[in-house]
Amino acid sequence: MSKRDILSVLDMEKDLSEIIDLSIELKKNRYRSYESLRNKVLGLIFEKPSTRTRTSLEVAIDQLGGHAVYLNPSEMQLGRGETISDTGHVLSRFLDAIAYRAYDHRNVVELARSTSIPVINALDDVEHPLQIVADFMTIKEKKGRFTNLKFSYIGDGNNMANSLMLGAAILGTDMYVASPKGFEPKQEFVEKARSIAKQHGSSITITNDPVEAARDADVIYTDVWISMGEESKKGEKEKAFKDFQINEKLVSNAKRDYIFMHCLPAHRGLEVTDGVADSINSVIFDEAENRLHSEKGVLYKLLSY
């Protein structure tokens, strides 16, 4: 069987909806004992800190009958100069899959090229595909559909914005992205998402007006303004994003039954107020829980052979 990598949301273009449905089914049967991935071993290489991704992946494969091995880059020969390629060739002999969280997307691609086992992008500077499965699973649970929705992302045009646009396009969801000038998503992702959206009768709209994005929204989503590794830009970005905070005034433009989403961790008082994050419209903790169930769906899809 040829290996399958998930480095981008595009690697799930043909079966994203199917993976989401599988994840929902696994959640419904969360207390059932599974041995689908018995004796399967998932390696975790994380260059960046993680709460949700690492924990949920470890629990996910355990609940499917396999187990995980955490590999700290600073404790590996990778941290002493061994190449990513050599590391990939060696780990392929021990593991059944690798989840890699990296600062540089090129390193994720290089690892995938050098392994004979699936490589999963567990977040890098370009995309966060695992988060997208959990996000749209949450939307399916809360709204019952992907189409005829206005999904608005308000914030930095970062890796999350890139992946969310691709996910929305694949699933036929109309999406607005509101970012300050100079902080919009990468044009290559906008163009690719619009091309896919056109095939599904949906649209991707880029704006610099957060009120336009929030108006009549069914879903409002945000992320941190300062991503990991961008600490030196804190002052600049806080100034640029001050009108893009998700607060009570902004969400008053949305539909009454809108849901608020955030991939977490949240910097409360910056990109979102406590009033919104803790409101009855907020689904951020359901969304976080769905990291577990959606990753079970992804791992089952990749490794149950």
From Swiss-Prot:
Gene Ontology molecular function: amino acid binding; ornithine carbamoyltransferase activity
Alphabetically ordered keywords of this record: Arginine metabolism, Cytoplasm, Transferase
Catalyses which reaction(s): carbamoyl phosphate + L-ornithine = L-citrulline + phosphate + H(+)
Record pathway: Amino-acid degradation; L-arginine degradation via ADI pathway; carbamoyl phosphate from L-arginine: step 2/2
UniProt binding sites for carbamoyl phosphate: 50-53, 77, 101, 128-131, 263-264, 291
Location within or outside the cell: Cytoplasm
Pfam families assigned to the protein according to its UniProt record, in alphabetical order: OTCace (PF00185), OTCace_N (PF02729)
Gene Ontology annotations for the cellular component aspect, listed alphabetically: cytoplasm
E.C. code: 2.1.3.3
BP-aspect Gene Ontology terms: arginine biosynthetic process via ornithine; arginine catabolic process to ornithine; citrulline biosynthetic process
Classification via InterPro entries: Asp/Orn_carbamoyltranf_P-bd, Asp/Orn_carbamoylTrfase, Asp/Orn_carbamoylTrfase_sf, Asp_carbamoyltransf_Asp/Orn-bd, Orn/put_carbamltrans, OTCase_ArgI
Residues forming coiled coils: none
Binding residues annotated for L-ornithine, in chain numbering: 159, 223, 227-228
Stored NCBIfam families: orni_carb_tr (TIGR00658), PRK00779.1 (NF001986)
Family: Belongs to the aspartate/ornithine carbamoyltransferase superfamily. OTCase family.
PANTHER family on file: ORNITHINE CARBAMOYLTRANSFERASE, MITOCHONDRIAL (PTHR45753), ORNITHINE TRANSCARBAMYLASE, MITOCHONDRIAL (PTHR45753:SF3)
Protein task: Reversibly catalyzes the transfer of the carbamoyl group from carbamoyl phosphate (CP) to the N(epsilon) atom of ornithine (ORN) to produce L-citrulline.
HAMAP family: OTCase
Protein name listed in UniProt: Ornithine carbamoyltransferase, catabolic
Taxonomic source organism: Thermoplasma acidophilum (strain ATCC 25905 / DSM 1728 / JCM 9062 / NBRC 15155 / AMRC-C165)
